[in-house]
Amino acid sequence: FELLRIPSVSAKPEHDRDVRSAAELLKKHFIKLDLDNCEICETKGHPIVYGEKIISKDLPTILVYGHYDVQPVDPLNLWDQDPFNPYIKKTEIHPEGAIFARGACDDKGQMFMHLKAIEVMLENGDLPCNVKFMIEGEEEVGSDNLELFVKENKEKLSNDIILVSDTGMISKTIPSITTGLRGLSYMEVELTGPNRDLHSGHYGGTVANPINVLSKMINSLHDSNNKITIPGFYDNVIEVSEEDRKEMNLTPFNIDEFKDSIGLIAEHGEAGYSTIERQSIRPALDVNGIWGGYIEEGAKTVLPSKAFAKISMRLVPGQNWKRINELFTKHIKNITPKTVSVKVTEHHGGQPYVAPTDTIGFEAASKAYEDVFSKKPIATRDGGSIPIIALFEQELESKTILMGFGLDSDAIHS
């Protein structure tokens, strides 16, 4: 619980010391496990924690990647308890009890699971391979400094397979291995109208309201079939074959249970695709936050000077996040009326990734699941993004096994 108690929110500067504390605690755990070459590797941002246990150069080497930073917890009033005060509660899904805290699944809990596994194997003297750990503190803000670290430390990070547990599985009783991740493009739009907030009675109807304008612009980003309207957005999308689509839709999935679990009244998404397809093999564009004007309690009749929106786009194979950034920026500027000015800011992003299923690593992971669950895991594609995965394959020339244990009920990022 000690690691979960640290509010290592990488997105907020006021938590920089906490992020550092999490890195230092992780290093202590590495040393306690008797890992070798344990170190905190400095970057221009938050550090990377490294440790290894090399038994023999003749044995294969697994590189375990994870992250110790977490998402912001806002809005705090929607939490039942302090998100950084972990506790165990029995639930319908987990009658044995589950840990509740920010990061319990994403990714402190899943990452720490590997440390405990190594601990047991070292105690029993049956560690069957070499193991390296590379745990970063910036995954939730795009892994901006990990790319340079990987490029500068290829020999240190050399491996036969990369193991990542930062994804999920279908259910507690149905194991799955993630074979694909969507990419990400994260943008911010700022509109400016008048040079200050105005009296909505004196100026309403005569001055363009940036919030009204931004709302119309955002609404225009999808057509009536929920397809994204940015010119060129779908140009390089690699379509999934009908055979693969049919196989994908054989995955155990109940739409009514899906809706009930998150309080939906009706389905939503791009016409012509199932919910499973919409959340994995199709791109998506969503507003992550929108604000402007007066948003505190009570009333203040203003016509705001500015309006803001943060928008993320999930990408699929064939799309390049930097190209999508360019298309988005150009389109937003083209549809901005002359009554306001616009500023578009690029944040982080990453490429989509598809993993092969014919590797030794995949076979080993599949066998491990089968040994525990007495059934073969199902290969699935995940709608989320881990920006650095595609880079691993490019720079380290090794494949990644996305062996996650998270469940939808974990409500990560909520």
Predicted regions and their residues:
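Acidic/histidine-rich catalytic neighborhood of metal-dependent amide-processing enzymes
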Residues: 103-180
